[in-house]
Design a protein with these regions (language model features):
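Basic polycationic patches enriched in arginine
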Residues: 2-3, 28
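Sec-dependent N-terminal signal peptides
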Residues: 3-12
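Sequence signature of WD/YWTD-type beta-propeller architectures
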Residues: 17-228
């Protein structure tokens, strides 16, 4: 999951809610151009986050904001922040508790979703062992919906285990995500309110990281198929 340690912008493309810690910013410095003289593909390549690991950034439907996960200080593990697409100050959107991942705007940009472990435990889960290479932790994530400022937090999934990697259909706002509720990591789809849950894949191995096509008639996703 954490394939990028910096977020880059291509300028030519376009229950009770827990208390939050004070809002902080991960943009510690002015956006700066990172294109080298040898660059042939990107017209304007800028670094817009500074400090910590910043990843899984997604555009608002209006193209004016980015939502992403970050572990810059003072966070002990990933939290969700939002910032203007031009790299302005970022604001904490998640609860500041547990670990979060995979945030996304809902259609209309008035609400967002993300996965979090904060109801399982307010503490950061133990990181996976990376001594033998990259390993994505299958923590006790559930998927939550909130207003775009992080208020009015509602839980959409409640099955034991891993529910995360959610993205949104731009047509009807339905959500596709990865879950291990069936005993394997499969793709599931639900309505924007968490209802009408149905399983989309049923093949041994990992299925995740799914995205809808623009008209939501197709999906693309990552898959691994163990042999033997």
């Amino acid at each position: 999951m954490r394939r990028l340690l910096l977020i880059w912008v291509i300028a030519s493309c376009c229950p009770a809610e827990p208390a939050k810690p004070a809002a902080t910013t991960s943009a510690r410095g002015e956006p700066r151009n990172q294109a080298t003289p040898e660059e042939r593909h990107f017209k304007d390549l800028k670094q817009i986050t500074f400090g910590g690991d910043n990843a899984e950034a997604y555009w608002s439907f209006g193209g004016d904001r980015l939502i992403f996960q970050t572990n810059h200080k003072p966070y002990k593990c990933d939290q969700i922040e939002m910032m203007p697409a031009n790299g302005g100050p970022a604001k904490l959107i998640s609860t500041g508790k547990g670990r979060t991942t995979c945030s996304y705007f809902l259609k209309g940009d008035q609400e967002i979703i993300y996965a979090s472990t904060h109801e399982s435990s307010p503490e950061c889960p133990t990181p996976p062992d990376m001594s033998k290479g990259y390993n994505w932790g299958l923590f006790e994530y559930d998927i939550y919906k909130a207003n775009a400022d992080g208020s009015n937090l509602r839980k959409l999934t409640g099955a034991p285990g891993y529910d995360a990697e959610a993205t949104v259909c731009p047509v009807d706002g339905s959500i596709i995500f990865t879950s291990e509720r069936s005993g394997d990591l499969e793709l599931w789809r639900m309505d924007a309110n968490g209802g009408n849950l149905r399983q989309l894949t049923n093949t041994p191995g990992y299925d995740g990281g799914a995205f809808f096509s623009q008209d939501c008639t197709k999906i693309v996703w990552r898959a691994s198929r163990p042999q033997g």
